[in-house]
Amino acid sequence: MGCPRSWSGPRRSFWPGEPPPSRRQATGRDGRAGRGPLERVPVIYNAALVIRSDIQFPPEHAALREDVHALGELIGEILREQGGQPLFDLVELDRRAAIARREGDEQARLELAASVRDRPPELARDLVRAFSMWFRTVNLAENVHRVRRRREYFRSTDHPQPGGVRSAIAQLKSTGVALEETLSLIGGLRIEPVFAAHALPATRRTLLRKQQRVAERLLRLGPGLTAQESGRLWNGIRFELTTAWQTEDVPRTQLSVGDEREQILFHLVEILYRVVPAFYEEISQAIGEIYSVPADSIDLPCIVRFGSWVGGDMDSNPDVHAKTIRETFARQQQLILNAYFEECQRLAERLSQSEERASISVKLTQRIEDYMRLAPGARAATPARRERMPYRLFLMQLAKRLRYTYEGRANGYDDARQFRDDVQLIAESLLAGKGEHAGLFHIRRLLRRIDTFGFHLASLDVRQHAAVLHRIISQGGDDPAWPDRTGAERTRLLADALNKDAGPRVELDALGKRNLAVFETFAQIRHRYGPRAVGYFIVSGAKGPDDVLAALLLARWASVYDKNTNQVTLDIAPQFESLAALESSGEILRALLAEPAYRRHIEARNLCQGVLIGYSDSNKEAGPCASRLAIHQAQTALAETIGSTGYRYAIMHVRGGSTARGGGRIDAVLKSAPAGAVNGVLRLREQGETIKQGYGLRPLAMRTLERAFNALSLAMAERNAPATPAAHLECAATLAEASREAYRRLVYGEHEFHDFFRAVTPIDVIERMQVGSRTVHRQEGSGLAGLLPVPWVFAWTQTRHMLPGWYGAGAGIAAAIERHGASRLREAYAQWHFLRNLVNDIEAMLARADLEIASAYNVLVPEGMRHFAETIRAEYERTREQVLWLKDATELLDGDPMLQRAIRLRNPYIDPMNLMQVDLLARWRAGDCADRGLFEALLASLTGIAQGLQSTA
């Protein structure tokens, strides 16, 4: 096959630009204008009338439309080839009916509803996989288009791209910040994305590599190619897509911690290893151009490093223990050493200078001789011509030492510093010997990678729940009454034990030994992989000072302390997750830092206290508005409390993929932060689809790092901005409280709501998924309280309710208007980025929600519980009305036409999967959830809908 245009067969295909062959009904447009804040807005759900041919593509997105069209034709050919003409015809039937239904064709609605019923499980699975394949490919095409648009921007203008490095540097200079101040500001920045596994479906590593290769070929397509060259690229794309069709989306066996680790390491090694040097070069070049200084004269410190939770997150994951931590570091070191090894080999081929033609430093010459003596017989085995090529010879020596390190043999490197010193010798020799344009650039790139990744690749945080730590303290301290003691009493007893260095009174049980073994591993890890290898020990579910002190005491029981200072050599960070913990976080830290035993610990740990704030639990507990305000206020309280002690602090945002769990662009986190809470540290947990969206391609990863730099540097420059006006805070407090009451009234007001949730969503399928190593429920909880936030959000996302992302906001806005007045609320929205970002996120969730599709799931609900669906629909109507009023808009996302268009184009392709999911759920449950074929079709539907919505949780 050549280019798509040469293919034979029907021209109708999966692409979101063609007008459907449907019967259209005339529709009117809602021309609302000038309404008051409480006037009723006619509800037009997202499933309602959207004339597809009316959706406009701006000229700058024409290339994306062409790509999607061509890829759609290709997928159609693959479906015919792999599944046969009947499968293709059914896909087309569903697709056309779904589009016509969206345009108001009642007959099409009935036909689609009838056609999805009672399909054999294997057929339903293939149909869902067909739509899923299209979405996966379109998602990739959209990412490729982002890369092309970025390149086109730089080709067409000299102006810095908004949100980029140059834009930040230009803004700093325009506000009068001198070069020295800019360099000092940058030197104080710390950007650390922390990658975590997802408890729900993630793209398999095999498919990630295939997607990378498809993206590379799409990026190479262009008008400058011959027909033969273009044809070869399209054949390569077809190969990857066809083999992807023949590959299982979801493994039949449960993913291990090792499987999850490989997905994260893919992005670190394949993407970020390549991107990091270019990121620093962009900063240097921007400073050089804007401040008119030589870029090479700018010496930037290391401001970007990476972390991971995969292999160290013990919370609700019994498969993580000391062995998995050791295995994780061993694997990470294997990969980074191999990357260095291959780079040294490539550089050895390129740096071919002869000693007769290039000046080589004495130090480098001496080091070569030293290494010759380290390896007996090396000189005899070295070709004479290579001896006269010192850089090549030395780089091959470095590669050999790296291999010895990899294999654990003698004469390997003890640590990354030794390796860096060797590479630095090459840089110094090149600089002194007129080699600035003969290899110095590439050597400096290697040095930057060593500074970033060391011999450990990424720091590993280890996390355990506070309740587990207290169970060990109770058992080891022979204190059965420990769980019933007050937090204050436990704090006093723990502080006393730390001051006396008291060990366990009885032999620990299996749980205690298992956890102490983790602490004991830390010293081994640091010795072997470097001081930055171990990140934080995170205490999840923290509610008081005693939770942190419990971790500190267990570390002492495991002898994780410096023999000289007698202090624990581990950074311990509480994770505040519940609404109450967030609201009390400042007081908790105040009490913790008042304990002399803990102050001694902090003073031995560079006077820095880490804290994590979680978005998920508080959202599940109180809804989006109350959760976000609590997080905002917690940042203020933590910054003030820790700052008042003179200690430094690092606040890490533990967020998920959806806005319900704190997802969204990195810069929004900083722009929404309270004045004074930003201190130069940006540590964000990245999880699930956000990793692929932000770091899936090298140019996208570069853009993600640039956005982080832009937002963090400008926030630091403006950190002395005025505090938020009290009037704005009062509006937000009223909004949050009223929304919380509405949310809790629905979710926790009647015990039957749990049964409604289990009936109306595919939570029972999610609970049985064999895809993640973590559990779906907390060990100590039951019912809704015990359900982890990830499956909670994922279940509502699947049904298109998107309930955790918006429910209660309408009640909150209405209450704020009633109490403070419409003009005051609008003023707060216009002037305060936090409130504006919150409302914009709620608007996006409302736009992604589809209450008409969601209503299809009501057939799964017993008649006596369907009133919950009516309550949800009424609150959706109210929230939509209030958001449109506050934004002075006619339709949701009028201010973001790109996202609005994407949702409207995608919806018809998601709808058939939802309707099939409803039918499959009904049949599976009717058979006592025993039919394996139906279950596998349901698993495919979960993946397909998630691909279409680009959201899990």
Residue positions per predicted region:
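Carbohydrate-active enzymes and regulators
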Residues: 93, 106-107, 141-145, 160, ...
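Catalytic or ion-translocation cores adjacent to nucleophile or general acid/base/metal-coordination motifs
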Residues: 320-351, 557-741
